[in-house]
């Protein structure tokens, strides 16, 4: 899966999420859990991939300098170790938004102090205002809202996330106007893109729509 964070002059690639240790079985898990399902907001994708990936060292080796590498912590000390491993000039997205990371969501402020072009924190749609306060107070000024909506059978993407993302945008822009917000969830056309931009988002991320790549160009131009 690739995710695209779109900007005025083009698109920046955000990789799939890498963890400290490899978690094999990605293709098998995609075939097993990826489904197109009906929801109250319309048909959408549901997945339960479980952060399957080849590990952080493969991520570092295969992430181009102009892309953003997504990373996640699964154990209490992982953020500290990841900070020591990841090059200090590499753009990163700290993914605290998957159900797998709920046990150890604690961020270190270490990443925030470096001069990276992008040091993004990706948050879940169900994040609280208090948790957002803490992230900003740690020094993080780029927040990506938001990841899939958790259910018993996996995370839901698409339009069902939009109300949550709009709420996060509203809170951040009212309380922390300096924070750059990357908004995503259900962006399938210019109307849904502009809905987030009009709410105050600085950038837009595209996820599920990348399954229909012919639609992407009309959104980012």
Predicted regions and their residues:
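Glycine-rich phosphate-binding active-site loops on the catalytic face of alpha/beta enzymes
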Residues: 15-21, 94-98, 142-152, 187, ...
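Alpha-helix-loop-beta-strand connector modules within alpha/beta enzyme cores
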Residues: 53-66, 106-125, 156-183, 219-221
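Glycine/Thr-rich beta-alpha phosphate-binding loop at enzyme active sites
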Residues: 96-106, 130-179, 213-219
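Active-site mouth loops of central-metabolism enzymes
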Residues: 1-2, 48, 68-79, 120-128, ...
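Catalytic cores of alpha/beta
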Residues: 2-6, 79-86, 126-138, 172-176, ...
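N-terminal capping/small domains of soluble enzymes
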Residues: 1-67, 72-74
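Hydrophobic faces of well-ordered beta-strands that scaffold small-molecule active sites
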Residues: 11-16, 67-71, 92-94, 119-123, ...
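Glycine-rich tight-turn/loop motif centered on a GG-T
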Residues: 31-50, 100-113, 152-163
């Amino acid at each position: 899966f690739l995710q695209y964070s779109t900007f005025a002059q083009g698109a920046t690639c955000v990789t799939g999420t890498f963890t400290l240790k490899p978690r094999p079985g990605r293709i098998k898990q995609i075939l097993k859990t990826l489904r197109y399902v009906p929801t109250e907001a319309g048909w959408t994708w549901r997945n339960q991939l479980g952060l399957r990936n080849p590990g952080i060292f493969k991520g570092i080796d295969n992430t181009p300098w102009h892309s953003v590498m997504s990373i996640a912590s699964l154990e209490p000390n992982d953020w500290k170790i990841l900070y020591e491993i990841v090059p200090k000039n590499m753009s990163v997205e700290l993914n605290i938004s998957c159900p797998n990371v709920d046990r150890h969501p604690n961020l270190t402020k270490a990443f925030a102090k470096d001069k990276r072009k992008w040091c993004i924190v990706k948050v879940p749609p169900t994040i609280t205002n208090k948790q957002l306060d803490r992230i900003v107070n740690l020094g993080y000024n780029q927040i990506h809202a938001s990841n899939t909506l958790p259910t018993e059978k996996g995370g839901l993407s698409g339009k069902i996330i939009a109300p949550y993302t709009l709420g996060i945008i509203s809170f951040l822009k009212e309380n922390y106007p300096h924070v750059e917000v990357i908004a995503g969830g259900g962006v399938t056309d210019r109307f849904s893109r502009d809905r987030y931009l009009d709410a105050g988002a600085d950038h837009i991320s595209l996820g599920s729509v990348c399954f229909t790549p012919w639609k992407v160009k009309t959104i980012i131009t």
